[in-house]
């Protein structure tokens, strides 16, 4: 029996000039998602997706590499300017932001959207190293 030829679906190139970069920086990883104004994801990347494993995912260098990769994917869609929303306490916040700027994006605004409780849930216990 002959196998049917599978069609390869190509991602259609959207021509979007401006968008929002969501930088989620945790203690263990840094994830960058670039969306359009409505919130539809255009490109994403993370330190783990770039091949960093374990504690190396949480470094600023890993965040920089992930941001460069995400920027390259977004520029293929014609994106030129970004608003940046930074979330989380991790070490990759500033380096990801610098990498997006160095990639050639015009950054129009930077917002910190880290959720801060008004004395909500009890936090986890402090680490004793």
UniProtKB/Swiss-Prot annotation:
One Pfam family per UniProt: Ribosomal_S11
Keyword Ion transport appears in the UniProt entry: no
GO BP terms in the entry: translation
Subunit structure and binding partners: Part of the 30S ribosomal subunit. Interacts with proteins S7 and S18. Binds to IF-3.
PANTHER family: 40S RIBOSOMAL PROTEIN S14/30S RIBOSOMAL PROTEIN S11
Stated role: Located on the platform of the 30S subunit, it bridges several disparate RNA helices of the 16S rRNA. Forms part of the Shine-Dalgarno cleft in the 70S ribosome.
InterPro entries: Ribosomal_uS11, Ribosomal_uS11_bac-type, Ribosomal_uS11_CS, Ribosomal_uS11_sf
Similarity section: Belongs to the universal ribosomal protein uS11 family.
GO cellular component: ribonucleoprotein complex; ribosome
Protein name: Small ribosomal subunit protein uS11
GO molecular function term, any single one: structural constituent of ribosome
Matching HAMAP family: Ribosomal_uS11
Keyword Iron-sulfur: no
Species in which this protein is naturally found: Brucella anthropi (strain ATCC 49188 / DSM 6882 / CCUG 24695 / JCM 21032 / LMG 3331 / NBRC 15819 / NCTC 12168 / Alc 37) (Ochrobactrum anthropi)
Domain of life: Bacteria
Keywords: Ribonucleoprotein, Ribosomal protein, RNA-binding, rRNA-binding
């Amino acid at each position: 029996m002959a196998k049917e030829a599978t069609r390869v679906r190509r991602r259609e190139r959207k021509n979007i000039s401006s968008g929002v970069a969501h930088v989620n920086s945790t203690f263990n990883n840094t994830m960058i998602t670039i969306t359009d104004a409505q919130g539809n994801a255009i490109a994403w990347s993370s330190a783990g997706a770039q091949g960093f494993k374990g504690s190396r995912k949480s470094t600023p260098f890993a965040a920089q590499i992930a941001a460069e990769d995400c920027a390259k994917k977004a520029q293929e869609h014609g994106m030129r300017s970004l608003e940046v929303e930074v979330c989380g306490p991790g070490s990759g916040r500033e380096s990801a932001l610098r990498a997006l700027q160095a990639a050639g994006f015009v950054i129009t605004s930077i917002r910190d959207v880290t959720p801060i409780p008004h004395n909500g849930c009890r936090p986890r216990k402090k680490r004793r190293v």
